[in-house]
């Protein structure tokens, strides 16, 4: 399960984080699944200074950084594409291959 210091501004101790299979460096909390529209609404908690697996989004994805620093990397993992701070929102296009993770204190993001 992802660990890291909680922000004094956002207390996630009461969130029931779950692992996602054998994937390392992240935990999730599923908020809603809309099967008929293929939409999953969830929170992701990224461990500090770690990257997750390379992946592509199957649809445009709305993302909001709730806490911490969310770092997006090129698929090689060597180069940083973007660093997004608390409060930053954006849309990831369909098919965009990347890896991502938390900054110094990790990150919590809302993804739809």
Enumerate the language-model features and the residues they cover.
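Conserved hydrophobic/aromatic beta-strand scaffold that supports enzyme active sites
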Residues: 28-30, 41-45, 62, 81-83, ...
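Histidine-centered divalent metal-coordination motifs
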Residues: 55-57, 98
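A short mixed-secondary-structure module that forms the rim of ligand-binding clefts
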Residues: 52
């Amino acid at each position: 399960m992802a660990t890291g210091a909680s922000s004094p501004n956002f207390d996630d101790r009461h969130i029931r984080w779950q692992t996602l299979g054998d994937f390392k460096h992240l935990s999730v909390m599923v908020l809603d699944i809309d099967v008929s529209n293929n939409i999953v609404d969830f929170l992701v908690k990224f461990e500090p200074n770690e990257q997750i697996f390379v992946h592509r989004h199957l649809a445009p994805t709305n993302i909001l950084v709730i806490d911490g620093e969310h770092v997006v990397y090129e698929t090689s993992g060597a180069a940083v594409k973007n660093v997004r701070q608390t409060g930053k929102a954006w849309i990831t296009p369909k098919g965009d291959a990347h890896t991502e993770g938390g900054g110094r204190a990790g990150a919590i993001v809302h993804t739809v």
